[in-house]
Amino acid sequence: MRPIKKSRSLKLPKSILEEIGESDSSARRGKRNHNLPHREKRKFARISRGKNGYENRKITEEGDSKSSELNDDYLDAHRKSSTKKKSSQNKQAKESKLLDPIAFQHKIALEEDDREIAHLEKMLGIKSKDKSAHSKIDKEFGWLLEDLDQEIDDIGVPGTEDPSYGHSEDSEVSDDTGDHGSVDELESEREGNSGEEEEEFHGFESNSDEFHQPETKPIRMDPLKPAVPSLPNANVGSKYVPPSLRKKLGGDKESEDALRLRRKLQGSLNKLSIANISSIIKEIEVLYMENSRHSVTSTITNLLLQTVMGRESMLDQLAIVYAALATALYRIVGNDFGAHLLQTLVERFLQLYKSKEKEPLSSHKETSNLIVFFVELYNFQLVSCVLVYDLIRLFLRSLTELNVEMLLKIVLNCGGQLRSDDPTSLQDIVTEMNLLLASADPSTISVRTKFMVESITNLKENKKTKVANASAQSKFEAVNQLKKFLGSLGNRSLNAREPLRVTLEDIEQIETKGRWWLVGASWNNVPSGDNTLSTEALQDKKKSEELTAHSKILQAAKKLRLNSTLRTSIFVALVGSEDYIDAWERVLKLHLKRNQLPEIAYVILHCVGNEKLYNPFYGLVALKCCTLQHNLKKSFQFSLWDFFNELQPDDDSEEREISMRRIVNLAKLYASLVIEAAQPLTILKHVDFMAINAQMQTFLLVFFTDIILGVKDDLQLVKIFENCKAEKNLSSKVDWFLKTYVRKNPLVDNSKKALFKSNLAMASAILQSISKEEI
């Protein structure tokens, strides 16, 4: 890039100079020479003395010194090729310089213009010295070059028309004939000026930005925003749509992945049965690993509800298997699955119930099927009794045919579970029902309504109806088998163990209060002002009371010699609970390992043995343990056999004296477990009936007396003693003990002697028949 001057003096056109004349030109020469810079004066003086022999120097395309540029423009365009005429050409050039010094200054100005034009041509992308390039000049900057050409024409510098100013390459050899000292001096001066001229050039580049359109600067990416280019058709002010709603906005067309997932789940549900439920759960777990959790959860929920709602009559066996599958997935996957299923189920049920409330009962097949499926979910402990009681209160608003049918479905399928979970709420339900019946016309009460009222009343009084139906028996066996399967899931790590405690209000107000199954997602209206202060005071008081009670419980644990941290934690969970259900839930929250489960049985038996009188609370907790955890059931058996070793030690060991209250309380505890089928009668297989001592005799006497008096009906008594078939010769041993010790039991009240004798005779007959079969 050629260096240029930052500014130059004003130049007059040739026509004006001719009009002024020779006299004016001489004065103008003096004035012009006077205003020249110091360096230009020195150059002009050297040229005037004829000491410069360095006019014609070879000009290269990449040269940037000022001397080469001056000599290039100063020489004439027509140079001669012969080397013999070099001296004459140099003389003519010197004479032309001496004749008109003003033309030399104009030549310098012309050189500056050429450099400026070359720079602009380069910036505009135009090849230099190309006349056709004027047609390619941008329309915006064409006026700039046109003015520069006009200015050159006005100056009219001699030498551009004079052929005597040679411009051939051969004439460059004559530069060496001059004075070498003057050449070196000129070279140093030109090199000294190169720095200033480069600075002037950079300044020109900064000013030349005004002649160009501003280029787009690279945009710096924001690290806090995703590096995704904006779409050309995207709306800048459009509202953000979450991924969960994009499918609804995009239409009902499902993707291939969703269809493939739906087919796989549908195939798994079609193969579902009690025998292969474990393998089906493993297949669904694999689908959870391969797909998004929400997709699998929503697809399973829709398929289950569609299958349940699509049947004319819901078979109990099918509802039980589907409910067991849903409960198992709830425990394995977590609260998200169970909450989504329960929320969707109740919403669809309420929608159907409210839309068809006044229609005949025959049009409520879907509603009836959904309530049966919901009841089975409650039986398998996916949902707590709170929501069930809320639905019962909803149905008790009016005794319509639909409400009576819904109440019967609930009472007949899960009445016993409701009574054991919350008997107080059941009493409130009976009270509301009686008030509703009192206000109704007796003539309008149907037979179905009377049967429903009778069933709820019997449930409150714990009167079980005798049902000898084969389907009911098969259903009972299927439920027990699936409950054992769900209990076996405790061997693996589970994400949910407790039933979902949700109310009907939470489900109905999910849009306003938020998702009830997420911690912190629901919103409650907190009162302000004095009410807030009083609430905080009550909370502080409650916390202080809890701390005091907790310290007392720890002291009681020390007195009972529960010194280990694990046993103390189990004791605090049991004693600090509100009821046996709360106690079981607190024990589950400890998340004990498999090898730590026997400690639960140890603490319960230890607490029972130290009570002054038998506390049925521990029996109910033990019943929960044996029913829901097979490992705990075995732990209670092993603990009983250890207790037998204490009661009747071996011949080598000394007999220990055990307190009577411990013997009686433990006998009553295990008798209650045998009555509820939580433990079989074969737990006595290690007892040597022919060599029992007084302590063992007392235990067995209390044990069999409670069983004979505690059974509800003959069928239950038959089931208990038929378990002796599993152990050979156990029936004959038990029969001998009943005839020898139990028949003459003085502890039986006179009011119960008749019942005691009849049940004892039936038990003896059962045992004798088993003994004959073994022979």
Swiss-Prot record:
Keywords: Nucleus
Pfam families referenced in this protein's UniProt entry, alphabetically: MA3 (PF02847), MIF4G (PF02854)
Domain MIF4G: 262-463
Gene Ontology BP annotations: ribosomal small subunit biogenesis
Region feature Disordered, mapped onto this chain: 1-101, 152-253
GO CC terms in record: nucleolus
Domain MI span(s) in chain numbering: 565-689
Biased composition (Basic residues): 1-11, 28-49
Compartment(s): Nucleus, Nucleolus
Domain of life: Eukaryota
SMART domains: MA3 (SM00544), MIF4G (SM00543)
PROSITE patterns: MI
A single GO molecular function term of this UniProt record: RNA binding
InterPro entries: ARM-type_fold (IPR016024), CWC22_splicing_factor (IPR050781), Initiation_fac_eIF4g_MI (IPR003891), MIF4G-like_typ-3 (IPR003890)
Compositional bias ranges of the Basic and acidic residues kind: 52-79, 177-193, 209-223
Main localization of the protein described in the UniProt heading: nucleus
PANTHER family tied to this protein: CELL CYCLE CONTROL PROTEIN CWF22-RELATED (PTHR18034), NUCLEOLAR MIF4G DOMAIN-CONTAINING PROTEIN 1 (PTHR18034:SF4)
Functional description taken from the UniProt entry: Involved in osmoregulatory glycerol response.
Family: Belongs to the CWC22 family.
Protein name: Suppressor of glycerol defect protein 1
Name of the encoding gene: sgd1
